[in-house]
A protein has these predicted regions:
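N-terminal beta-alpha lobe that positions the nucleotide/phosphoryl donor
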Residues: 1-178
Length: 178
């Protein structure tokens, strides 16, 4: 069963390094490995990536960009208390932005496809793969949150939102300011 590409998700089997702007470095690399190594007998886990476009859709539809700029513009990262307040506010804004219905539906359908392929006991990891991660000038390794042993659609949707919000952990904000 092969799903058609959507603007919300991409299957690892359909990704390559050219997709880095769409799904980030980790996901693009997983896709590249899947395509190159699976035919050679190397077992690479299949799964899907939620695209940067899906993230932007959520923030666009909830008009969150203005709130994020208000929370973060002019922030002095040396003021630890201000950084903590701004980070908490930014995470609240992103986590609170409703997931667009088309994104939610697409993620649910992808989850169901994975369950059909891998079984009812399926558990997955939800990891960041920011499009700015692991660039030649910066490595964002360890700056964002990872969620392991995710089971069930509701838990998956929540983990996706929490992972997206983790783009604004205090350490990630501070790192980006540098």
């Amino acid at each position: 069963m092969t799903s058609a590409p959507t603007s919300c998700i991409r299957w690892f089997r359909d990704l390559s390094l050219t997709d880095l702007p769409l799904v980030g470095g980790k996901n693009a690399s997983l896709g590249e490995m899947f395509q190159q190594l699976t035919p050679l007998g190397v077992r690479i886990p299949d799964g899907f990536a939620v695209t940067a476009e899906a993230y932007r859709d959520a923030l666009d539809e909830s008009d969150a960009w203005v709130q994020l700029h208000r929370a973060l513009d002019g922030l002095d990262k040396r003021d630890i208390a201000a950084l903590a307040r701004a980070g908490a506010k930014a995470r609240e804004i992103v986590y609170g932005a409703p997931m667009p219905k088309h994104v939610e539906t697409t993620i649910r359908e992808a989850w169901r496809e994975m369950k059909a392929r891998f079984g009812e006991d399926l558990s997955v990891a939800v990891r960041s793969s920011a499009t700015a991660e692991d660039l030649p000038t910066a490595s964002f390794a360890g700056q964002h949150d990872t969620y392991l042993n995710i089971r069930g659609e509701e838990t998956l949707l929540d983990a996706v939102k929490r992972c997206q919000a983790s783009l604004f952990t205090d350490r990630a904000i501070s790192y980006r300011i540098d």
